[in-house]
Each structure stands twice: as structure tokens, then as C-alpha cells.
């Protein structure tokens, strides 16, 4: 399985709680309704992995969320990328500027290999 894995940091003026609320309840629905059916059909999953505060919460994790978008193969990932980086995908990119520090985002294309559940 091919995945786009993005390490996301919130903007400095956005609290962690506000970031999570916006990402889950505003951006994710925008993601779902903005993507045309032919592009949505190539996505196998969309997952937000939010950082958990540990200890007293006085220190921030280096990233606030790790987002995964999965595809069955590299061509399907390219279909998504063409849409996202094109004019129609601008609606998502513009929305990301509202709550993400996009200058700190790290994006990696990965090939997932599940090792097993007994490890």
C-alpha cells in the first residue's frame, strides 16, 4: 500500500485544542466534500493521528498530527496529487493555511509493509 504521510504542525497562533477541533470538524469534512468522485475512488483511507499530551503538557511535540492518505498503487497516488496540486485542490491548500504551519510540514511517500501483530 502506498501512503502519503504528512507530519503537521499547527500555526503558532492556534492552540492544540483549536487545531484538533478544526482539523477534525472543519477540514476533514471539507476534504471529503471537495474531492471529485473519480479522485475519491482512488483513496483507500484518510487518517489523522493526533499527538497526545503527556505529563504536565508544558512541552509540545515536534508535530501535532501525522496524517495518512492511502492508495493501492503509485498511479492512484499520482491521480490524487494532480488534483491536490491543481486548481481544484486549491480549496484544501487554502484551508490548510488557516490552521497549519505549512512551512514546517514534512511529506513522505511510503510503501507500507505490515510485519504482523505478534511483534
Feature roles, as predicted:
Residues 1-119:
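Macromolecular interaction modules
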